[in-house]
């Protein structure tokens, strides 16, 4: 065999062998791929939400329990007045009730009698009396308007002597200069009692009344029993007069 022939045969064998290797490689698997399976990998990220589907048909389940009542709503506006109802039947005539006040009247009369007795006892023990008149002196000095108010509260009046005996009684109970219930406030030198009646009995001190300063419109009883005109705003003792 010549050298050329040998070379040609070697080339043919090489080509056949290479083709055989190629086919064998295609029919076999790689070393890594043909080994045992590996572990599962981590889950991938969630995909995007799909489009909203159509509303399904109502289910066939049982109805749930009723929920708790809600809060009371605000009061509504007042309604229109209703129509007048029918007149009811006339009621029976009531019976008159008479209240017996006999016992109460008797008790009131007894209390009044007791008060009169107490008042008389006080007047007799703390005052001078002439007949049915009692004269009681205060220990405070005040102008005539307050003197009138004080005697009025005690159900009396400012003492006004009608005669010499009453004048002495007032002098004895006062024991100091005291107002008399006599003025000439309405008409100068026309002296009247506090009810507006002109006085008939007088007992002026010598030279009185002199109306010094044109403001002496009230009268006081001096300690000697004589009278003197003074301003009504001056303060003197008060003698109140009470009648039995």
UniProtKB/Swiss-Prot annotation:
The coiled-coil domain mediates trimerization. Residues 38-96 form the Collagen-like domain. It comes from Rattus norvegicus (Rat). Calcium-dependent lectin involved in innate immune defense. Binds mannose, fucose and N-acetylglucosamine on different microorganisms and activates the lectin complement pathway. Binds to late apoptotic cells, as well as to apoptotic blebs and to necrotic cells, but not to early apoptotic cells, facilitating their uptake by macrophages. Oligomeric complex of 3 or more homotrimers. Interacts with MASP1 and MASP2. Interacts with MEP1A and MEP1B and may inhibit their catalytic activity. Its main location: secreted. Disulfide bonds join 151-240, 218-232. It is found in: Secreted. Residues 45-57 have a biased composition (Basic and acidic residues). GO terms for cellular component: collagen trimer; extracellular space; multivesicular body; protein-containing complex; serine-type endopeptidase complex. The keyword Kinase does not apply. Residues 43-99 are annotated as: Disordered. The modification 4-hydroxyproline is found at residues 43, 58, 69, 78, 81. This is Mannose-binding protein C. Keywords: Calcium, Coiled coil, Collagen, Complement activation lectin pathway, Complement pathway, Disulfide bond, Hydroxylation, Immunity, Innate immunity, Lectin, Mannose-binding, Repeat, Secreted, Signal. SUPFAM superfamilies: C-type lectin-like (SSF56436). The keyword Signal applies. GO terms for biological process: antiviral innate immune response; cell surface pattern recognition receptor signaling pathway; complement activation, classical pathway; complement activation, lectin pathway; defense response to Gram-positive bacterium; innate immune response; killing by host of symbiont cells; negative regulation of viral process. One of its GO terms (molecular function) is protease binding. Residues 129-241 form the C-type lectin domain. Residues 108-126 form a coiled coil. It comes from the Eukaryota.
């Amino acid at each position: 065999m010549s050298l050329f022939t040998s070379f040609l045969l070697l080339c043919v064998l090489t080509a056949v062998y290479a083709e055989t290797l190629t086919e064998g490689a295609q029919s076999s698997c790689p070393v890594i791929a043909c080994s045992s399976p590996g572990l599962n990998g981590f889950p991938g990220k969630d995909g995007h939400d799909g489009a909203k589907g159509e509303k399904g048909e109502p289910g066939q389940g049982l109805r749930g329990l009723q929920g708790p009542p809600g809060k009371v709503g605000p009061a509504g506006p007042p309604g229109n007045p209703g129509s007048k109802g029918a007149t009811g039947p006339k009621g029976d005539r009531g019976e008159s009730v008479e209240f017996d006040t006999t016992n109460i009247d008797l008790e009131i009369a007894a209390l009044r009698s007791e008060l009169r007795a107490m008042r008389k006892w006080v007047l007799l023990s703390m005052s001078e009396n002439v007949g049915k008149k009692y004269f009681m002196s205060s220990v405070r000095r005040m102008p005539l308007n307050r003197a009138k108010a004080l005697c009025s509260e005690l159900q009396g009046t400012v003492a006004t002597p009608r005669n010499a005996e009453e004048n002495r009684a007032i002098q004895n109970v006062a024991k100091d200069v005291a107002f008399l219930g006599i003025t000439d406030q309405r008409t100068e030198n026309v002296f009247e009692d506090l009810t507006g009646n002109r006085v008939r009995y007088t007992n002026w001190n010598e030279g009185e009344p002199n109306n010094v300063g044109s403001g002496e419109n009230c009268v006081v009883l001096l300690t000697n029993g004589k009278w003197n005109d003074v301003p009504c705003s001056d303060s003197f003792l008060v003698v109140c007069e009470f009648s039995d």
